[in-house]
Amino acid sequence: MSVALDVKNNSVEKTKVLVRGTITPGNIVFQKELDVNAHTTEQVKFDKRYFPQLCIDQPRLWWPNGYGDPNLYHCKFEVMVDGRVSETKDVSFGIKKYSYDKEGNTFHIYINDIPVFVKGANWGMSEYMLRCRGAEYDTKVRLHKEMNFNMIRNWLGSVTDDEFYEACDKYGIMVWMIFG
């Protein structure tokens, strides 16, 4: 697994920062120290080649609704300056293998090497115009789960809020992005 995030220095001078991440479950800790020039943004990358703790043996896999639990990991990032926490960010994510083929002129989707029969609905401009936020996404995506759906087609990529994707991850709903 690899992880990347942007660190922005809003100060007028170069600043030494420590970026630390903790992934649970597993209590996987990784950190890197770097200098960030004044008024710049630096991308910090953590790669399993240099941070072997990012190789998760026997991970709890994320599954679409109807195929298993949508297991999620949580990563807490801390950016520290002079030994004090300057900024934090929490991120949830699932670990899965996605593949597809078009054998026999039919599109097949596989999650974790298992064929998935896609059942879902379209979200488009009308849902975007409803201006869902926060808990509203959770409720609407949960209803898709309860209808035994496992995919939402995000027509024209019109829904872009983090809360939408977080709810989909939580309930095992795959997102099919359709643009133009």
State the predicted function of each range.
Residues 156-180:
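N-terminal catalytic cores of secreted or lumenal carbohydrate-active enzymes
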Residues 1-155, 159, 170-171:
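Secreted/periplasmic carbohydrate-active enzymes, especially glycoside hydrolases
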